Regions:
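ATP-dependent helicase/translocase motor core
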Residues: 1-116, 125-141, 162-166, 186, ...
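Conserved motor-coupling elements within RecA-like helicase/translocase cores
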Residues: 149-167, 180-181
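Conserved catalytic network of the ASCE P-loop NTPase/AAA+ motor domain
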Residues: 110-112, 159-161, 180-183, 221-225
Length: 230
């Protein structure tokens, strides 16, 4: 209630399956939020405090964040027991992607057994941006995020880790190796705008040198062969 007017948003769906018209009615609002189990879930898992310079900012998830995160977590639970393919979490610009990732990471800790979350980007500035946002919400996440400083640092953070951890890295810190960094199944990899991490699974042969090379996606998957990816 202390937010500026532009931060007031509508709750446009009752069940996440249908977005109401431009202006919602009261039925959509009340049935979308105030079902007892959902209301308790929102209070418990979808309100966080972000530590800003001006003080703690209280953040409530928007309707699209709530329903999308819930669906992503359910897909993650299935993926960790299956092929590791969670899917794509799509956002429009300015719709709160970073905070959706925070809510997702928070909820995963209750739904999976001590998961390690690896956040991969393609640029240092984006890596810093996401790391900063997660660090502001570390009380909500119940752990302190870690930013890998180098390839060797990434190896030391992942190799031998048995549980927990939110680790930030760029994809350039992964490298070809005969040994995986971890064989655990409860590792979840979030790639954000890291498009090169989505392709490059096949081997390529350099016709001049005869050298065989693999793409970034293959390198990452080889490093964490039993992880699940979103």
């Amino acid at each position: 209630i202390t937010s500026n007017e532009d931060r007031y948003m509508e709750w446009k769906t009752k069940d996440g399956k249908y977005e109401s018209s431009q202006f919602i009615d009261y039925d959509t609002f009340f049935e979308g939020i105030f079902i007892k189990e959902r209301f308790i879930d929102i209070i418990k898992n979808f309100i966080c405090f972000s530590k800003e310079e001006s003080g703690a900012a209280k953040i409530l998830a928007a309707y699209h964040q709530y329903f999308a995160v819930k669906k992503a977590v359910e897909r993650t639970k299935k993926a960790t027991q299956g092929d590791g393919k969670i899917g794509v979490f799509w956002h429009t610009q300015g719709s709160g992607k970073s905070l959706s990732m925070v809510f997702y990471a928070h909820l995963l800790q209750d739904e999976l057994s001590q998961p390690t979350i690896v956040v991969i980007t393609d640029r240092n500035d984006l890596d810093d941006q996401l790391y900063t946002q997660f660090s502001k919400c570390q009380q909500f996440l119940r752990q302190i995020p870690i930013q890998a400083k180098s390839r060797e640092d990434l190896k030391s953070l992942l190799a031998g880790r048995e549980a927990n951890g939110i680790i930030f890295t760029t994809m350039q810190k992964f490298e070809e190796s005969d040994e995986p960094l971890s064989l655990r199944r409860n590792i979840v990899v979030m790639t954000d705008e890291a498009h090169r991490g989505q392709y490059g699974f096949e081997e390529k042969v350099n016709e001049e040198t005869g050298k065989i090379s693999i793409g970034t996606a293959r390198i990452i998957h080889n490093s964490l062969p039993n992880a699940s990816f979103i």
